[in-house]
Design a protein with these regions (language model features):
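Nucleotide/phosphate-binding catalytic cleft detector across ATP-hydrolyzing
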Residues: 1-144, 163-165, 174
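Acidic, glycine-rich loop-and-beta core segments that form the ion-binding/anion-interacting portion
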Residues: 137-187
Length: 187
């Protein structure tokens, strides 16, 4: 019904959408891979080896991975936020992050939109879309936490060095805060 109204008002037929996925009951997984480079110059081959030795490509039982990426690189305890190729070192670490939501929830939404002949082009975690809409490039580069306070939940997105590093949501929203304030005033 809402989509029909939107199509009527815009005088276009809605064929596809980008769909926000709430982060409540989501899963964040941090992992790491380490390889020895024995004083050699780091190349893309070393990076591929470190990625292949990790759980980066593994799926999560009952969860759909929405975002996965390398947070940073570590060469002999020095952190790099960009590709460390052409540097020399002994130990190369890659730090990974995966964000996932329950697979059944995602499948239900996909089926719902397929049933009304609307293609979902991309599933976007709600905290990420809120952050991209509100943070500028300086915020993301310097480091920022974007908290979107909703009625019954709040979503969180963290950026550092222009890189997303964490997404989550908690089941505390403005309704909870309002009730707490009212309770505090009444006593």
């Amino acid at each position: 019904l809402v989509l029909n109204e939107a199509a009527k008002e815009s005088q276009t037929k809605i064929k596809s959408i980008n769909l926000n996925i709430p982060a409540v009951d989501s899963l964040s997984v941090f992992s790491k891979s380490e390889i020895q480079v024995a004083g050699e110059m780091i190349t893309d081959l070393h990076l591929k080896k470190a990625i292949n030795n990790s759980d980066f490509f593994e799926s999560l039982t009952d969860y759909e991975v929405m975002q996965k990426f390398i947070i940073n690189y570590n060469v002999d305890d020095k952190i790099y936020y960009t590709n460390p190729s052409n540097n020399f070192g002994n130990i190369l670490n890659l730090n990974f992050y995966k964000f996932a939501v329950k697979k059944n929830y995602v499948n239900t939404l996909i089926k719902l939109f397929n049933d009304i002949n609307i293609n979902i082009e991309e599933l976007i975690p709600t905290p990420l879309s809120s952050a991209l809409a509100t943070l500028n490039s300086d915020d993301k580069n310097l480091g920022a936490i974007c908290i979107d306070l909703g009625d019954s939940s709040s979503s969180i997105a963290m950026f550092e060095n222009n890189q997303l590093i964490f997404l989550d949501a908690i089941k505390v929203g403005s309704k909870n805060i309002t009730h707490d304030i009212a309770r505090g005033i009444s006593t």
